[in-house]
């Protein structure tokens, strides 16, 4: 028996080595921004593809590869690439695969020559219905010349968050429609963040916005104006608040920007000090008897 098995070991090892080398010609990886996402977030991740094969790979048809000549950006080459890249998403409980709900590509068009690599942004929530809290697994897949190259599966959770406060918006132009805004807390990295969620009475769920770190001394506030503006105020630290502005219409919800605001308890005193320092207001001299 030994005389039969031993000669096969080197051949088996060589075959396994060749198979491993073949499978490592193209590597694809998926890096999640976080391990937990609040319902409605876009679920951002970065796709990392490295081409160690002798071929030029990519997606998008005719794709230009750019280079530099001095300080100028020039076209170095143009390739016709028709490989496939996609992400498979499963519920970890029963390993049921989710259907893709979008028609768009997962990443931007690209072409990679031998020895090149590229990082590409993707938003998993744009392509799959992740509206229910659950644990999911995402696996990146690249297909070239009929060979499927799979990356390491990544697990992430979709959660409701801890509800802090809510507000309701009514629309004069559409009486039957109501929009509920809610602010929720959840950990993100090493700090706690506050998120704005929005859902319409007809079931439409809008994209959840991460408003950044919050210090939970005070509850955050939502103000809904009659003209469609929505303001969120939350405490960033001991002396500073963040004011976020949104524009909310029956068929649109847009983030308009944010600004820093001094702590309301010290803002008045600080303003007076600035006026005195600049000479804008002269201190009033009160007679001593007016204090009695």
Task: Label each PLM-derived region with a short phrase.
Residues 153-180, 259:
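Low-complexity, Pro/Ser/Thr- and charge-rich linker/hinge segments at domain boundaries
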Residues 7-17:
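Bacterial N-terminal signal peptides
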Residues 127-162:
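Terminal connector regions
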Residues 24-30, 38, 42, 50-123, ...:
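Contiguous segments within soluble domain cores/interaction surfaces
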Residues 1-4:
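Positively charged n-region of N-terminal signal peptides that target proteins for export
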Residues 195-212, 242-260:
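Surface-exposed loop/turn elements that mediate protein-protein interactions on large endomembrane-trafficking
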Residues 168-170, 214-223, 258-273:
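Repeated scaffold domains used in trafficking and secretory/extracellular systems
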Residues 173-189, 193-196, 221-237, 268-284:
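Short beta-strand elements that form the blades of beta-propeller/WD-repeat-like
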């Amino acid at each position: 028996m030994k005389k039969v098995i031993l000669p096969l070991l080197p051949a088996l090892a060589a075959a396994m080595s060749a198979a491993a080398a073949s499978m490592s010609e193209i590597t694809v990886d998926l890096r999640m921004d976080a391990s937990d996402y609040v319902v409605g977030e876009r679920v951002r991740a970065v796709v990392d593809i490295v081409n160690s094969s002798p071929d030029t790979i990519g997606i998008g048809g005719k794709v230009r590869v750019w280079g530099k000549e001095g300080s100028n950006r020039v076209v170095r080459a143009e390739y016709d690439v028709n490989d496939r890249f996609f992400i498979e998403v499963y519920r970890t409980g029963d390993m049921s695969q989710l259907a893709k709900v979008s028609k768009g590509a997962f990443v931007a068009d690209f072409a990679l020559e031998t020895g090149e690599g590229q990082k590409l942004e993707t938003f998993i929530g744009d392509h799959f219905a992740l509206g229910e809290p659950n644990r999911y697994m995402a696996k990146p897949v690249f297909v070239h010349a009929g060979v499927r190259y799979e990356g390491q599966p990544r697990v992430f959770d979709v959660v409701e968050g801890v509800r802090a406060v809510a507000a309701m918006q009514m629309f004069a132009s559409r009486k039957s429609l109501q929009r509920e805004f809610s602010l929720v807390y959840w950990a993100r990295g090493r700090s706690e963040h506050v998120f704005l969620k929005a859902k319409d009475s007809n079931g439409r769920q809008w994209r959840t916005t991460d408003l950044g770190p919050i210090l939970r001394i005070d509850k955050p506030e939502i103000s809904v104006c009659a003209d469609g503006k929505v303001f969120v105020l939350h405490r960033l630290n001991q002396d500073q608040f963040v004011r976020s502005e949104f524009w909310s219409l029956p068929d649109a919800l847009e983030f308009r920007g944010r600004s820093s605001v001094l702590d309301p308890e010290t803002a008045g005193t600080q303003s007076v000090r600035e006026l005195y320092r600049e000479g804008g207001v002269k201190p009033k001299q009160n007679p001593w008897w007016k204090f009695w």
